[in-house]
Amino acid sequence: MQFRINIIDDEKNLNDLVRTYLEKEGYIVYSFYTYDEALMHKDDDVHLWLIDIMLDRASGFELFNEIKASRPKMPIIFMSARDQEFDRIIGLEKGSDDYITKPFNIKEVILRINNLIKRSYDDPSKIKMDGYDIDLEKRRVFNGGEEVILTT
């Protein structure tokens, strides 16, 4: 399963750089450069948002609130040039999962995203549905711990 990430940063070069590295890691990435553009996608079926705080028309904090209102469990990482302790504390108090200050090491960003994805989502090869446990990788189904024999 490929995980999908939305990025909002009005610095096009930085946005494109992060997107390129995430795509090399196997993520499907959608980039937005304006608050309004990102707001239209707040309900997208993605696994994580990477949000710059200083945007064109409104703040990343406002976008965060919009996303969390409809998707309260959505993992969100703030990234910002606002590197004062006060700014980081506000971001984390709002409920973000992480706060990365610019400039940053892209490898560190990738590792933070990888770790958050692992913590936030169960093994994608295993599904629970209507009391059944389905192991897609091994192609086996279990009901109450007992394997269900499937035939064609």
Kindly give the residue locations of the regions a language model identified.
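Conserved sequence signature across two-component system core domains
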Residues: 8-9, 32, 49, 100
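Short, Lys/Arg-enriched segments at the junction into DNA-binding effector domains
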Residues: 4, 114-152
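Basic, amphipathic DNA-recognition helix from helix-turn-helix-like DNA-binding domains
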Residues: 11, 59, 65, 69-128
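Active-site beta3 strand of CheY-like receiver
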Residues: 45-51, 55
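Conserved phosphate-coupling serine/threonine residues in phosphotransfer and NTP-handling enzymes
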Residues: 52, 80, 151
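His-Asp phosphorelay/catalytic-motif detector in bacterial-type signaling
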Residues: 2, 45-47, 71-75
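Helix N-cap/capping motif at the beta->alpha junctions
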Residues: 31-40, 60
